[in-house]
């Protein structure tokens, strides 16, 4: 289930040309995304955003934008089904995760967040997020929207699984791919999430 770069696949297959391998792999990633797009997440959902490093042009580097929308960074919505379980003997609570979704965002507006929620999450869900101003309308699209101030506890407990997914995706991309262009980031996320959702298969 480990990812392979197109170069590595070309090498293992003993093919002379790189381009056909690259095109084939991207078609597979697109198919993975189409398959996972057939269903929506339901139940208790963690929602947050992560910024992924992508290749930037020399012109973009010269502009040197910082913060949100920074050069070389792309914003992505990460969603995870998360169920709270309580140990009968100790009373200790823990979160168990099931399925994930990831979608590249072109901006940080509430309109795009709302659209992502509508197409990715069941209306009967309970959604947990931080208190970003972009999330003010989420309650209109789910059963209950619970917000918490963004801090270390939120990252490690309330939104634990989305942050684990973000961290693992970044590590996966860094270890397997030299550079990812922004326009292809969604395809790489498709592959990562597809495999993550089938980790027990």
Question: Model-found features: residue ranges?
Answer:
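Residue-level recognition of single "structural anchor" positions
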Residues: 1-201
């Amino acid at each position: 289930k480990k990812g392979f770069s197109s170069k590595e696949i070309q090498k293992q297959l003993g093919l002379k040309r790189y381009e056909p391998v690259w095109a084939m792999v991207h078609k597979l990633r697109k198919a993975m995304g189409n398959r996972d797009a057939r269903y929506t997440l339901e139940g208790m959902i963690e929602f947050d955003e992560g910024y992924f490093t992508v290749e930037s042009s020399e012109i973009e580097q010269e502009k040197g934008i910082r913060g949100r929308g920074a050069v070389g960074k792309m914003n992505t919505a990460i969603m995870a089904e998360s169920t709270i379980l309580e140990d009968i003997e100790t009373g200790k609570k823990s979160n168990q995760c099931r399925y994930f979704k990831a979608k590249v965002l072109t901006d940080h507006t509430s309109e795009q967040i709302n659209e992502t929620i509508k197409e990715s999450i069941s209306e009967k869900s309970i959604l947990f997020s931080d208190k970003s101003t972009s999330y003010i309308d989420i309650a209109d699209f789910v059963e209950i929207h619970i917000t918490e101030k963004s801090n270390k506890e939120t990252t490690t407990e309330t939104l634990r699984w989305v942050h684990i997914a973000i961290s693992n995706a970044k590590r996966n991309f860094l270890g397997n791919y030299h550079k990812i262009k922004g326009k292809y980031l969604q395809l790489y996320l498709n592959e990562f999430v597809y495999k993550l959702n089938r980790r027990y298969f």
